[in-house]
């Protein structure tokens, strides 16, 4: 417990840097300095991984070393702030006058960013419900199913989510720029291309993960054969429709960019809460643990269909402008 507390406190010290780092990289995307952002993130990842290996295997720092690792992996991004201070490297220069709070701007930031905040809360609800159902429906094997969900949600689905984020984070600044410039044809083309390439890419990733489910789960789950078997079997079910499910995240990011907060909030909650939670309860009580896994597939499919419908409606709207 003391080791864990030390790790949490260490990360808390570095938390301000991680917040600044996330903000800076987001602004870099808007400023179209994607290569600089990518270089900064790559360097931070290399440094953080090297530190994790050193602190774990050589220095034996335990959880405290992991706290520093998490802080470094994102906190180093904060160095990017110097891109916006002094000189003419960017049009978005920060001056002392900008440090004064403008509550009107703060309100606008809160309004546009609120959907993303709700998505984070939605994932908490989603994880809580899934763990609770797997534990209760799994009986004596409940802890094994919870561990399997941890592997799937923490690693397998995280991999697919990172792929989806590449598209959604790339779409957002371009969509915001084109919307501001009233370049509706470019905005429509950008949205269409992003969704098409995202579905195709995630479909290929899904096939790869489905075929390699056992070795991938073994890599993350360790040497427990029972856990690997349960996680691999569940993975082959859960990932079947993620190529559709993550369309909601991209559409939410798009609607945030064009300042349609209501629809952005709806699509942000669609996969994790609106579809997944009721279906997990319904199919879980009907089919047991297998019903929970199947519920995630059905939720992804429904989420994808709704997202495609919203994208089609938005494309028609843009065509009339």
What is the predicted function of each stretch?
Residues 1-14, 54-114, 175-241, 282-321:
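Short alpha-helical transmembrane segments in multi-pass integral membrane proteins
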Residues 10-30, 37-48, 66-82, 168, ...:
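Short runs within selected transmembrane alpha-helices of multi-pass transporters and secretion channels
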Residues 14-18, 111-177, 198-205, 235-249, ...:
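Transmembrane helix-bundle signature of multi-pass secondary active exporters and lipid flippases
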Residues 21-37, 146-213, 246-267:
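Small-residue-rich hydrophobic transmembrane alpha-helices
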Residues 26, 53, 116, 173, ...:
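Small-residue-mediated transmembrane helix hinge/kink sites in multi-pass secondary transporters
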Residues 50-54, 132, 277-282:
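A gly/Pro-rich, aromatic-decorated transmembrane alpha-helix motif that marks the paired
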């Amino acid at each position: 417990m003391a080791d864990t507390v030390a790790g949490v406190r260490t990360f808390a010290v570095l938390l301000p840097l991680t917040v600044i780092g996330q903000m800076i990289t987001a602004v870099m995307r808007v400023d179209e300095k994607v290569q600089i952002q990518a270089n900064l993130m790559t360097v931070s990842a290399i440094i953080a991984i090297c530190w994790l290996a050193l602190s774990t295997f050589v220095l034996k720092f335990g959880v405290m070393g992991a706290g520093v690792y998490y802080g470094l992996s994102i906190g180093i991004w904060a160095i990017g702030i110097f891109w916006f201070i002094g000189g003419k490297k960017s049009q978005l220069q920060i001056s002392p006058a900008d440090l004064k709070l403008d509550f009107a701007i703060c309100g606008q930031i809160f309004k546009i960013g609120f959907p993303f905040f709700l998505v984070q809360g939605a994932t908490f609800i989603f994880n809580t419900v899934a763990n609770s159902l797997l534990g209760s429906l799994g009986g004596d094997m409940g802890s094994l199913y919870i561990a399997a969900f941890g592997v799937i949600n923490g690693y397998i689905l995280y991999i697919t989510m990172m792929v989806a984020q590449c598209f959604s984070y790339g779409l957002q600044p371009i969509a915001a720029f084109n919307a501001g410039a009233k370049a509706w044809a470019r905005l429509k083309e950008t949205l269409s291309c992003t969704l098409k390439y995202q579905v195709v890419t995630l479909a290929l990733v899904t096939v790869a993960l489905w075929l390699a489910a056992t070795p991938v789960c073994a890599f993350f789950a360790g040497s427990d054969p029972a856990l690997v078997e349960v996680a691999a079997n569940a993975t082959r079910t859960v990932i079947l429709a993620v190529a559709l499910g993550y369309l909601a995240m991209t559409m939410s990011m798009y609607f945030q960019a064009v300042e349609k907060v209501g629809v952005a909030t709806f699509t942000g909650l669609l996969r994790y809460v609106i579809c997944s939670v009721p279906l997990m309860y319904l199919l879980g009580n009907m089919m047991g643990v297998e019903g929970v896994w199947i519920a995630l597939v059905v939720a992804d499919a429904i989420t994808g269909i709704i997202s495609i419908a919203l994208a089609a409606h938005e494309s028609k709207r843009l065509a009339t402008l």
